[in-house]
Amino acid sequence: MAKHLFTSESVSEGHPDKIADQISDAVLDAILEQDSHARVACETYVKTGMVMVGGEITTSAWVDIEEITRKTIRDIGYTNSDMGFDADSCAILNTIGKQSPDINQGVDRTSPEEQGAGDQGLMFGYACNETEVLMPAPITYSHRLVQRQAQVRKSGELNWLRPDAKSQVTFAYENGKPVGIDAVVLSTQHSEDISQKDLIEAVMETIIKPVLPAELITSATKFFINPTGRFVIGGPMGDCGLTGRKIIVDTYGGMARHGGGAFSGKDPSKVDRSAAYAARYVAKNIVAAGLADKCELQVSYAIGIAEPTSISVETFGTSKLEESRLIELIREHFDLRPYGLIKMLDLERPIYLPTAAYGHFGREEFPWERTDKAEALRAAAGL
């Protein structure tokens, strides 16, 4: 019986890199509300008392970058200078320019269907049947822990919690299937007035136990709650934050390969984002159709060219079909040209801020999580 361990991590919305991601996507959403065809590449840097928002944006819209930034920080929970970061008093620098006309001429076309990719690159999508949302178990439960941390912090149930937090979950696998949780790490920022003993007890009872299924916990499961013993200094005061620095947290927790491109702050003409969403959509429908237990799809593009330069699929020996037949089905049922995938998933809408914390995948509210192609794929496969 083959046994192994696999670990994934997540971070909360108050982590410095996630603050940056959320500001970038809040700016994107505000622009898309007014101009659905805008070209946006918005990058954010945060540090104690300061936010710098930059990038290249071409749009007919006007948005108040400063107010969007302050509201995003406020909604996360940084509302007091005692935390080292305050939405109402931090300095905000705006260094946004326009997208290069050299890129525009490659993307924009007289015929919308021939819209070129906004850049070259390779993207991966993945799905597996380990969880009900067809995501790997380690990243799924890592996200749920920090989501629960934010929930009890914002509700006031644990009013000594602060916005910054990190989680990590190690699963034990037998023959490729998750069978239990080997280790859990949860570090959460807190106020000065809570003892380590009380913190550990409250985090275990209020955050960990309600999230992790009891049947996956054993007497051998190890728990590490604030293992340094103190986490008062956090957020941008503890570390600087930058858009696009949590790409594994954003995707599959390391279980699948990654093409290297980040998501937040990018409009859907950027295939780094939109094609990664489409690849997840394809992989999830293949698994939902029962054509494979695991599916990893790679798609690649050349700047200014509509058709993907390659499509490849890996099912790790779990497919009921030849992988060449899977690729035929993908080409028949999914339009992976930039224009096609934008229309297929209705991406020219202000839907991106919620993606910027707790993972872009495995959350049913997003259009790329639909399994509406599964039945047609199954029928076409003759299963």
From Swiss-Prot:
GO molecular function: ATP binding; magnesium ion binding; methionine adenosyltransferase activity
Region of interest called Flexible loop, as start-end residue ranges on this chain: 99-109
Binding-site list for ATP: H15, D164, A165, K166, R230, F231, D239, R245, K246, A262, K266
One GO BP: S-adenosylmethionine biosynthetic process
Binding of Mg(2+), residues: D17
Binding site for K(+): E43
Top-level EC class: transferase
Keywords, comma-separated and alphabetical: ATP-binding, Cytoplasm, Magnesium, Metal-binding, Nucleotide-binding, One-carbon metabolism, Potassium, Transferase
Function statement: Catalyzes the formation of S-adenosylmethionine (AdoMet) from methionine and ATP. The overall synthetic reaction is composed of two sequential steps, AdoMet formation and the subsequent tripolyphosphate hydrolysis which occurs prior to release of AdoMet from the enzyme.
HAMAP family: S_AdoMet_synth1
Protein name, per record: S-adenosylmethionine synthase
Upper lineage: Bacteria, Pseudomonadati, Pseudomonadota, Gammaproteobacteria, Alteromonadales
Gene symbol of the encoding locus: metK
